[in-house]
Every structure is written in C-alpha cells, then in structure tokens.
Amino acid sequence: MALTDPLGDLLTRIRNGQRARKDSVLSPASKLRARVLDVLQREGYIRGYSEEDLAGHSGLRIELKYFEGQPAIQHVARVSKPGRRVYSGSKDLPRVRNGLGITIVSTPRGVLSDAEAREQNVGGEVLAEVF
C-alpha cells in the first residue's frame, strides 16, 4: 500500500517510539524526513539520526532523547496534511506553547524551525509542531 503522508508516518513512529521508551526507531529515508530530523536535532528534541540500509532500501535510525526518564518530545503533531495544506508568512508563523515549542516550516530556503524562518524573514508550509 502506498504511503500518502510520509512525514506524518515519521512523526507517528517517533511518538510511538517514545511512548514505548525505545532508544531508537527506524523509518524509511527521504530528503524531507532527513531535513525535518535535522531541525529536530538542532533544536535538541532528538539525539541524532543515521542512514542505514534496510533490506535493500535506505532507512533512517532515529536516536530518541529522554530527560530524567521523560521523553524530550511531549507533543508532536502534523499541521499541514495532504488533504489540507497550511501556509504561513514569516510574520504569521504560529508560536507553539508561547515559544516553548517549535513549528517546523518548509521554506524556499529549506526546512527550518519557526525561529529560523522569522530570522530569515521567510514563510512557507507549516509542516508540524513540536514541544
């Protein structure tokens, strides 16, 4: 069966892995997934990720992060979905938990956090929110 929302699948794998207290989770690889993981790593929500070979296909092993036994990611949600795309200008980017969380945005300059997008004065598709 074809995957209609690869990014939603990635976020669900991370959410489920943290609920199950896993050290790492596997996900099929794509450029978009890797860029989103770059943002999560820069912002300190995951320890890191590496590319692996999974039965002839490339995959990503995501190292999950915990703080005092609690997952670093308390909430992760897809904002722009295949059936309803959500776009925002740089001045209208949503703040998650009054700035405590991040919004992941796909911009012409790449996948950025909301703070980076505001700093570079670019808007784009609001992919997900994390805190």
UniProtKB/Swiss-Prot annotation:
The gene is rpsH. Keywords: Ribonucleoprotein, Ribosomal protein, RNA-binding, rRNA-binding. Coiled coil: none annotated. This is Small ribosomal subunit protein uS8. The keyword Ribosomal protein applies. It holds the Pfam family Ribosomal_S8. Belongs to the universal ribosomal protein uS8 family. One of its GO terms (cellular component) is ribonucleoprotein complex.
